[in-house]
Amino acid sequence: KTVIVIEHHSEFIAEYCDEMVLVSDGGVAWKEPAQVGLNRLNDLRAENIHPPQVTQIADAVPAGMATVSDGRYPVTVDEAETALWAESAPPGEQRSVPTEGATEPESHSHSREKDAENGDREPVITLRNVGHGYPTLREGYNQVLDGLNLDLYAGDRVALVGANGSGKSTLLRLLTGLESPDEGTVSVLGQETNDALPEELADDTVYIHQNPEEMFVEDTVRKDIGYYLKNRGAADVESRVEEILTYLDLEALADRDGRLMSVGQQRRASLGIGLATDPTVVLLDEPTGSLDLQSRREVTGILRKAESHVETVVIASHDLQLVAGWADRVIVLNEGDVLADAPPAAVFDDAELLAAADLRQPQVVALSDRLGFDTPVLTTDAMVEAITNKTASDATPAVGDGAAPDTGIPNTTQTLGEEQ
């Protein structure tokens, strides 16, 4: 049998695919063994495709440090472990590496720690014993959320993660008032959603759809932002439109029809519409879904800008690289319940938890565990910095010693071909 997949996630390709075809401008650019194709970094980046995290790391550390036996960069965690630390320790011994910038794992019971940290502060969002579901033809009633209790505070960057059907999008809709819980209460900024119309809640809470094209009703992005502001009763609409276009770097899209733009452009413009009224709470459903490398960077940049204007941001996402690098609180949902509520390091360092929630551990976290880092490393930049600093430290001779100590890192001189 032959299985053909259309896939942007290069880690999946590295683990499961034998061959790789790059399609560009309506034609086949090349066909290569997957390990070779994932090493054609210039070609991948030209098409805005993320190479695997371990490949990005190998490309960024000092030349020759992280190549495998045939001279290419690693594409899987197994290959990266061998390439980086093949000579680091005797068989069966794991090296312990202090990691500057890494995050110490914490308890999965984030709520108790957060209660102590927040003291007597009032939560921005409160859910108490929330149950919700939908009627189905086969099962009668599908319980999506069951007895959910959560408190979210100002300053939280919250990521809801879990498999399809775990309740992420349902939870976001409950927070907007677009749906009412079958059981329990949902309160946003002290107001129960059952006691308010969705348009009243929209004064302070903005929901940015998973399908961004649903947010465009006018024939230009400029008019769409103005339309939303007028409907919210905003003052000085024209100057506010120009302000948001400039602040979020949307000027190039301002006079284009949002319905005819690419998905990445639509996502950026929809964020402009949602952030125009300076909301207190922003809810985003799959903000980087179906985006290429460049669009993902642009959307992530807008999210970071929003932090200075918005009290609480909640995203539902399958993009665990985004979650690891952006969120400070990760809520893992599974079959209507909270499996974990903790900082990213604690969540992504727990292989058993991830398996129970049907989530894949980011390559960089798995690699930091394999290499014996004291704490999980959450981003490729942090891993590159840690490896580079460790190498420089190990390579510095002690006083009175004429030779540098063994770094524990293979000093291979193999380099990649010009195709890179």
Each language-model region and where it sits:
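ABC ATPase nucleotide-binding domains
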Residues: 44-123, 354-420
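Helix-to-loop junction immediately C-terminal to a conserved catalytic motif
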Residues: 176
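Conserved ABC transporter NBD signature motif
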Residues: 184-192, 201-202
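Conserved ABC ATPase "signature" region
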Residues: 235-253
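Conserved ABC ATPase signature
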Residues: 257-261
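ABC ATPase C-loop
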Residues: 274-275
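Catalytic Walker B motif of ABC-type/P-loop ATPase nucleotide-binding domains
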Residues: 282-285
